[in-house]
Amino acid sequence: MTQTLSQLENSGAFIERHIGPDAAQQQEMLNAVGAQSLNALTGQIVPKDIQLATPPQVGAPATEYAALAELKAIASRNKRFTSYIGMGYTAVQLPPVILRNMLENPGWYTAYTPYQPEVSQGRLEALLNFQQVTLDLTGLDMASASLLDEATAAAEAMAMAKRVSKLKNANRFFVASDVHPQTLDVVRTRAETFGFEVIVDDAQKVLDHQDIFGVLLQQVGTTGEIHDYTALISELKSRKIVVSVAADIMALVLLTAPGKQGADIVFGSAQRFGVPMGYGGPHAAFFAAKDEYKRSMPGRIIGVSKDAAGNTALRMAMQTREQHIRREKANSNICTSQVLLANIASLYAVYHGPIGLKRIANRIHRLTDILAAGLQQKGLKLRHAHYFDTLCVEVADKAGVLARAEAAEINLRSDILNAVGITLDETTTRENVMQLFSVLLGDNHGLDIDTLDKDVAHDSRSIQPAMLRDDEILTHPVFNRYHSETEMMRYMHSLERKDLALNQAMIPLGSCTMKLNAAAEMIPITWPEFAELHPFCPPEQAEGYQQMIAQLADWLVKLTGYDAVCMQPNSGAQGEYAGLLAIRHYHESRNEGHRDICLIPASAHGTNPASAHMAGMQVVVVACDKNGNIDLTDLRAKAEQAGDNLSCIMVTYPSTHGVYEETIREVCEVVHQFGGQVYLDGANMNAQVGITSPGFIGADVSHLNLHKTFCIPHGGGGPGMGPIGVKAHLAPFVPGHSVVQIEGMLTRQGAVSAAPFGSASILPISWMYIRMMGAEGLKKASQVAILNANYIASRLQDAFPVLYTGRDGRVAHECILDIRPLKEETGISELDIAKRLIDYGFHAPTMSFPVAGTLMVEPTESESKVELDRFIDAMLAIRAEIDQVKAGVWPLEDNPLVNAPHIQSELVAEWAHPYSREVAVFPAGVADKYWPTVKRLDDVYGDRNLFCSCVPISEYQ
């Protein structure tokens, strides 16, 4: 036997699991593209001056089992205290049926944002249910399909209030003093770049202030008080002031809807509908507004439309508001939202239904009443008479109370002067309440839960009668049917079957990096050591998190060539925003606050100009040459014209045109020459890792899409993570946090996300990926991603010309197929090809980005040659079908492409088409068939007849 023990131990086994093509397949593809080896191919494609001489030092690979054991040991350093801190975060009970069938199910978590509605009807229905929950609980007319968190939703509400305000000269935004501190933090950060003045005061004093365009109120207040704002809102409305309310979703089950009180905008966190705290996230925010403001709303909105056969179908509505179309004029820079978490909250509401939710809310409130009655009976004073689940208890010996709490492994809110805060939740039991009595009163309190229960059951006055909800909620059948586990399991499976995710087929979306989300990477996110921590718990209780985050940050520093990494941004768009703010504050620190011009190539992703606008910058577009590269002559001219006002350039590398631009270092030098900074968008980092790095290239700051390059799943449209890497001179200007001091960060800047480490509970996914791949595997992943893209490009080039190539006719990790000549010849469009691919069992590539009339394909390293060939064969078969149209065999108005996709019911319907049923639904011998449930959507109908709440069950049948 010639193998050594080290070889038999095979610590790099996961590399072969993650990378799709085996060694033999890789060699076949290398032969097809005319390269001798992966290193030779990389050497041909990547400019010599930016190739790393040595790989980043992130360690050797580990097996799945070794990495899990190592991370488990780290996680065990976290202390699982019972947290009553509140402040927008509570413990939950995630129903096991949802845990197993959604959160742990790749059919849900590996799907992409539903831009292709025909393959997304399941999660679109779940999101429509989420919108219905939002509408019922807020009492408003229009709801979005989730935002990133409550604090960023507050910032979006402020921006929206200004957009819709009739008080055009007013420039002040009022925030009630009992709004959660992290919310105020994020609002202040956003207001600064928009030039708004934020006024913080008692809500009842709002009328003392002038020039207010909008008001933010909290229901329930951060220390627990329920407010009856009916009269105040009425007065504010009479003065044309836009009113936003941050609301507790569980409290809204019992309380009067803010919309009924006159609020214009209502938002909040849906976390306590089944989503673990996870040390701060990810969590979905809900957001609702009056119908008249619908076109000013941020984020995705799911609407009811019709398909080509006239059947009810769902789609993302009014996309013309969004960044990928409106760019710097968009309502928001939001791209990824929190779809997976919104769907968990949605299904939590479906499973419990209105009766179950009321039982949970009433139980929480009853236990709070019992706790309040016992404390008052023993002489303690409550700061607020009206409350739902949170008590603000005045204590003489605060230090003693906190010491007893710590000894009992309990966290109380401790930042209130001369008082402690206690927030109960759905996990709270009568035993927990007895333990709280002991902490606050001593062991010999003599209180009895049943006796107190009898007292408060007949005489509870903690919710004002006027604030009790008097209307029914969740009356739609979907919330009143699936309450047994069997029914719920089948309902969730029926939704899953409607969608196309990575567990069924390759998703070749360009600029999206739909790679493997390995099971070993996903396992740790549901460990209670990670899932149950409150984001504001004492740091000594989160030593495991701190170690894991620090180690991940260190790896990312080495992989990016930067000096520091900030983990706070909880999406790629938030990362862009945070990075641009760092640049802005850096210039201000040098008395160069006038630098506000951001250069952006014409090919840029839509979030770039939208983020620049949010950061208070002016966007100046730089032209691209005929080869799709940044036009250096135009860049120099624009930089010189900007002069002392140049703030930065935002550039993606490899470019969004799918090539490694040879002049990238020269681009950086030109911008630096004029005093600007270089923001290198990390969207295409999957073609850099181990080969080059942004810092080595010459950039100053980048965001990293951990949900692309570093294996966090897309979740059907979120969660994402967008940490930023910065050079040392920008490190003092990354986001900070008003509640938690971030260890190792000297920044004094405001927050961009509610939690200090963003969506911390999904960071273990990226930790596991890097740990299992090691330096060797990470570089190989980038190389195979490049190989796979070039293999597709070379095989499809004759049928679908590749629009842009780099040196030696190569592409980077993705390629753009130019459909425009075919469309001109035949009338068949990129849309027709995209929809026809569904019949072949594939999600479409990215359509018309970054160039209209094209398809951008990114296969990633995780797809095997077998799957690549299946996709290539499908594309070539479609090209043959287009030739049939061109030859007149099939008319342009009636052929398999323009009628695609085809659904099962067509097999048994009358058939009058000039092609067979077999050609329609089993083209080119497709065997493993994915069946879409709707035909092509009517986008125009959907936007002209906007309807964004649940439709009758009969419409789905």
UniProtKB/Swiss-Prot annotation:
GO terms for molecular function: glycine binding; glycine dehydrogenase (decarboxylating) activity; pyridoxal phosphate binding. Pfam families: GcvP2_C (PF21478), GDC-P (PF02347). GO terms for cellular component: cytosol; glycine cleavage complex. The keyword Heme does not apply. Its EC number is 1.4.4.2. The modification N6-(pyridoxal phosphate)lysine is found at K708. It comes from the Bacteria. It is an enzyme of class 1 (oxidoreductase). SUPFAM superfamilies: PLP-dependent transferases. Keywords: Oxidoreductase, Pyridoxal phosphate. One of its GO terms (biological process) is glycine decarboxylation via glycine cleavage system. It catalyses: N(6)-[(R)-lipoyl]-L-lysyl-[glycine-cleavage complex H protein] + glycine + H(+) = N(6)-[(R)-S(8)-aminomethyldihydrolipoyl]-L-lysyl-[glycine-cleavage complex H protein] + CO2. Its cofactor is pyridoxal 5'-phosphate. The keyword Lipid biosynthesis does not apply. The glycine cleavage system is composed of four proteins: P, T, L and H. Belongs to the GcvP family. PANTHER family: GLYCINE DEHYDROGENASE (DECARBOXYLATING), GLYCINE DEHYDROGENASE, DECARBOXYLATING. The glycine cleavage system catalyzes the degradation of glycine. The P protein binds the alpha-amino group of glycine through its pyridoxal phosphate cofactor; CO(2) is released and the remaining methylamine moiety is then transferred to the lipoamide cofactor of the H protein. This is Glycine dehydrogenase (decarboxylating).
